[in-house]
Design a protein with these regions (language model features):
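Active-site helix-to-loop segments that bind/position phosphate- or nucleotide-bearing substrates
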Residues: 9
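Short, small-residue-biased leader/transition segments that mark boundaries at the very start
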Residues: 1-5
Length: 205
């Protein structure tokens, strides 16, 4: 197993679709987590990590969305102009195991964990020089938790670094070695993360 290949819903609350559109509130979720901790049902580290995601990262993203305003979604720091690759619409159109697995997750559930979203899908879009607005539109269409206020900062600011560093200090870009180290995808892939050129060279490398 690995961080990227853990079973689909293990260790994940799957609350983001409900939180992001306001069907439940952050306060309700945090209160429920605290009650479970107080009853001794969950360890402190799990409770703290979960609450940090809710009142830390989630609220930061919400603030970024409103602080930078409507123009933020149109930023394109690297002037990337390529259209979305066909593989983003069909898991059968790539031999890259990590990418195919992430796309299959979308096809099956309209959801994948944030790590493959960032380090596989977004990483590929950035390395392939995809136009940020194209990638943002796709993310908004395919993910069940894709509220506008969530996706605009996550894609423009973090995934594509299209804001030139207003939100994050550096682009989240990684090569095949990172994916190999953090997952078990590469062992069954036709591409070799250690090769940069040739037919078996990993596109991420």
């Amino acid at each position: 197993g690995s961080e990227m290949c853990i079973r689909d819903r293990l260790y994940h609350s799957l609350l983001s679709p409900y939180l992001n559109v306001g069907l439940i509130t952050a306060d309700e979720v945090i209160s429920a987590a605290l009650k479970q901790f107080q009853k001794g049902k969950i360890p402190l580290s799990s409770c703290e990590g979960f609450i940090r995601q809710i009142i830390g990262w989630r609220e930061y993203i919400h603030g970024i969305y409103w602080y930078f305003g409507e123009e933020y979604r149109h930023l394109n720091h690297f002037d990337s102009q390529r259209k979305l690759l066909p593989l983003f619409a069909d898991s059968q159109k790539t031999s890259m195991v990590c990418v195919a697995d992430a796309i299959k997750g979308i096809e099956k559930r309209s959801w994948v964990h944030h790590i493959p979203r960032l380090m596989v899908l977004s990483n590929l879009a950035m390395l392939a020089d995809i136009k940020p607005s194209e990638f943002l539109s796709w993310m908004r269409e395919v993910f069940i938790d894709a509220a506008d206020w969530v996706m605009v900062p996550n894609v423009v600011g973090m995934s594509m670094h299209a804001d030139g560093g207003k939100m994050s200090t550096k682009p989240y870009v990684a090569g095949g070695a990172y994916i190999s180290r953090m997952s078990n995808y590469c062992s069954s892939c036709k591409y070799n993360p250690k090769e940069r050129t040739g037919e078996k060279a990993c596109p991420f490398t």
